Amino acid sequence: METLLWKDAREKIKKGVNFVEFAAPWCPDCVMMKPVIEQVEQEIKNLNLPVNFYHVNADESGMFRKADAEVAVLRIPTHYIVKDGKQVFIGYEYFPKHILVEKIKELFK
C-alpha cells in the first residue's frame, strides 16, 4: 500500500479502481485493520485485478472530523473504494476482509 498525502492521492484516484484508507498511527482500530488491509491487497493482487491501494494519514490530511472537508473522514479508519474518481463504497472502522474483497470484485463483473 502506497502512503500518500491527500493532495497527491486525489489526483491518482481519478482513473481506475482505487482503495483509499484514511487512518492514523495512534488509532487502535487502524492498527487492528492494517493486517486485514494487507490481506485484501494481496488477495486482489492474486486475482490479477488492477486496483491501486493508498494510505492517507487522517491527521496530516486535515480532513479528520471536519464536516466541511472534501472527503468525509468522520471516523477512522475510513475506507473508500473509488472507480474513475467516483466513490462507490465507504466503510468505517473495522470491516471483515471478505466484504472488502467482494466490494472490489463487484466492480469487475
Swiss-Prot record:
InterPro entries in the cross-refs: Thioredoxin-like_sf, Thioredoxin_domain
Keywords (A to Z) from UniProt: Disulfide bond, Electron transport, Redox-active center, Transport
Domain of life, source organism: Bacteria
Matching Gene3D superfamilies: Glutaredoxin (3.40.30.10)
Keyword NAD: no
Keyword Nucleotide-binding among UniProt keywords: no
PROSITE patterns, alphabetized: THIOREDOXIN_2
Domain Thioredoxin: 2-109
Disulfide bonds: 27-30
Similarity annotation: Belongs to the thioredoxin family.
General function of this protein: Participates in various redox reactions through the reversible oxidation of its active center dithiol to a disulfide and catalyzes dithiol-disulfide exchange reactions.
Name this polypeptide is given: Thioredoxin
UniProt source species: Mycoplasmopsis pulmonis (strain UAB CTIP)
